[in-house]
Amino acid sequence: MPTKKHRRKDPESPQEPSEKTKEQLVEGELRKLRQQFRKMVDSRKSFNFRSQQKITNQRKEIKTLQEEQDEITLLLNLIKSSRNLDLNEKNYLELRFLLQTKEDYEALIKSMKLLLAELDEKIVQMEKKIINQRQIFTKIQEANNPRKLQKQIHILETRLNLVTVHFDQMLTTNAKLRKEIEDLRHEKAAYDNVYQHLRRRLLTKKKTMNVAIEQSAQAYEQRLEAMARMAAMKDRQQKDISQYNLEIRELERVYDHETKLKSFLLIKLNDRLEFEEQSKKEEALKAKKYGKKSKGASFESYEVAHLRLLKLTKTGNLNQLIEEFLAKEEKNFARFTYVTELNNDMEMMHKKIERIQNEILRLRSQQKSSHDDSYSILRELEEKLKKTTEEADMYENDYREITKTLEYLKNSVENLFKKINCDATKILVQLGETGKVTDINLPQYFAIIEKKTNDLLVLESYKRLMEMEVAEAEVQPSFLNPFWGGSALLKPAEPIKVIPPVLGADPLSDKLDEVEQPLDHSSLRQMVLSHYATRESRNRDSMPEKGDELKSKKKVTV
């Protein structure tokens, strides 16, 4: 009866939780719907607020645009009025008249400027002509005095010698400076090459250092991962060992219980066998005694055993007892197989742990060796980097000093170029030139400066010559001897016609103008000597002609 009640209650029990779950689901859906409703209400409010803001902004914009339209229409009406149109017409006519007058005056000013420029050119030409005439007149006057000419020639030769010496010194210094500049350029190129080579080496060293750092970081990460794996495996091993110990204890307890049950059942079976043997013996005796009553006795013995077995069972069901016995035997067999499997697993785990420990030791040794190698490589790289940085700093300092000297030379060349008013059109015509002195156009600036110095030296010599001529012209005439009274009766000597030299055609200056490249000391010296030789040959040719003329004149007078 109690079993029936229990069976009736079983189908009713799942209905109660299903209703509760349904109510919970309904409540959850209601909450979700309420939340959605609240969100929809909030979104609607926000949308209404935004739409109202947009409408107000649009109204404001419409209002401002309407005001602007009103202002524009008002301005258009004012502009289109007849009074404003008349004023505009008057202003237009006045402006046109003023522009016409401006153009006329500008044309007049241009014509007057052209006239003034022509007059200035004429004045300059006339002044040049006057200066040339004066120079020719002074030359003619000075040419009549041969002593003065000889003295002047001697002075000019000495001055020319001094100037040539000074010029030679300038050329030697210039050549030395050029050589120094070339040496500095070569040194700069060598330092640049070394700097680039060291920079490339530094970059490669940095790359190798980065690779070594990455490898060391990877090795460190691998070591950390291996250590984490080792720790995890140790924890897992400890957990497995504790679990294994618990399971072994449980199995030992179950095994002890089963052994006790088996021993109890064996004792019971032995008792039953002894009882059956005694019963068999009694039955045999009874069979011998009674003969015919053997079958009844055996049946009675079976009944006695059956009753004893029924006493052993609580419910009085032998089938249930047999099933329980078989189930226990199966459980014991399954536990025995499980214990054997666990033993095998434990052996495998021990082997695996030993293998992992050996692998960990090997990895540690490899990591130690790699760490030592990487440390030694890093030390070598640091030493090399230190050396390369020191060399790079040294080369950079040399490069800075060279650049400073070059900058000083460039600045001095530029200042000298500006002071002596050299013409830089030939350099500026070239592509990429900005008017500044650079490493590329420095020889061109030197050539122009050299040419200008030659011109200045020629002008200086000419100026000194003119000063000497002026000084000699201002000297008073020599004292006349009073005792030479008869000298006044003598016929005065006729003036010697001396052809004045043409000042415009100077062969040396023409040759210097023709030369485009800077001259060496030897070439310039040769040019000056050839010019001096030609001038002396001319003087020698002119002297006998003058002597012949004087002789002929004396003969005529006699």
From Swiss-Prot:
Give the region (Disordered) as residue ranges. Answer: 1-26, 531-558
Q: Which residues form a coiled coil?
A: 48-289, 339-416
Q: Which InterPro entries match?
A: ODA-DC/CCD, ODAD1_CC
* Biological processes per GO annotation: cilium movement; outer dynein arm assembly; spermatid development
Q: Where are the transmembrane segments?
A: none
What are the annotated GO cellular component locations? axoneme
**UniProt organism field:** Bos taurus (Bovine)
The Basic and acidic residues compositionally biased stretches are 9-26, 533-551
What is the recorded function of this protein according to its Swiss-Prot or TrEMBL entry?
A: Plays a role in spermiogenesis. Involved in the elongation of flagella and the formation of sperm heads.
Question: Could you identify this protein by its name?
Answer: Coiled-coil domain-containing protein 63
- Write one Pfam family the protein is assigned to: ODAD1_CC
Could you list this entry's UniProt keywords, alphabetically sorted: Coiled coil, Differentiation, Spermatogenesis
